[in-house]
Design a protein with these regions (language model features):
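N-terminal secretory signal peptides that target proteins for export/translocation
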Residues: 1-10
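Short alpha-helical segments used as structural interaction elements across diverse proteins
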Residues: 11-12, 98
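N-terminal export leaders
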Residues: 13-18
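Sec-dependent N-terminal signal peptides
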Residues: 19-25
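Exported/periplasmic ABC-transporter solute-binding proteins
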Residues: 34-167
Length: 167
């Protein structure tokens, strides 16, 4: 007896394979391998090479607003849904997505910051903006950190080193 297959659906295994392929394509399209380290990147003229984890946290929380007396920090943060953002929310901010949004709304409302972080939609966009914006700092997949930008050490460690905190 022949099994009937609808013209719309196909078999269960075909659907499962298609969904699995789409899932893998989504991971590949995100540009970030699961478990890859996250690099903090700045322009080469930023006068900092190393940050302690506490300093990094203050930077991304907007508590440190200047690199030097005349070079303002501009935070660039990946859009919601990016793996890099999830890692940074968990490790640096130690907040959920909702807490992060509320934190920046309150900080701007209290006039502790002129605005929240600027949103970027890819590591490539982050790198391009950091290159052209004095004082900008962003986080990108360490494997995609572009040449020409400075990768900051965290607690004296570069991405890929044992003990590096952002992964």
């Amino acid at each position: 007896m022949r099994r009937h297959m609808s013209k719309r659906g196909g078999s269960f295994s075909r659907r499962a394979m298609l969904l699995a392929a789409l899932g893998l394509a989504g991971i590949a399209a995100s540009g970030t391998a699961l478990g890859a380290d996250i690099a903090i990147v700045v322009r080469p003229d930023v006068p900092v090479d190393n940050l302690t984890f506490a300093e990094l946290r203050r930077l991304f929380l907007g508590d440190r607003q200047f690199w030097t007396s005349n070079l303002r920090v501009t935070l660039l943060v990946r859009a919601p849904g990016a793996r890099e953002r999830e890692v940074v929310l968990k490790t640096i901010y130690q907040m959920s997505e909702a807490q992060f949004r509320q934190y920046w709304i309150a900080k701007v409302f209290r006039a502790e910051a002129a605005s929240g972080p600027r949103i970027v939609y890819s590591s490539e966009m982050a790198a391009e903006l950091v290159s052209g914006m004095p004082g900008a700092v962003a986080f990108v997949d360490a494997d995609l950190a572009p040449k020409g930008l400075k990768v900051l050490k965290i607690n004296g460690l570069l991405p890929g080193t044992k003990g590096y905190p952002l992964h």
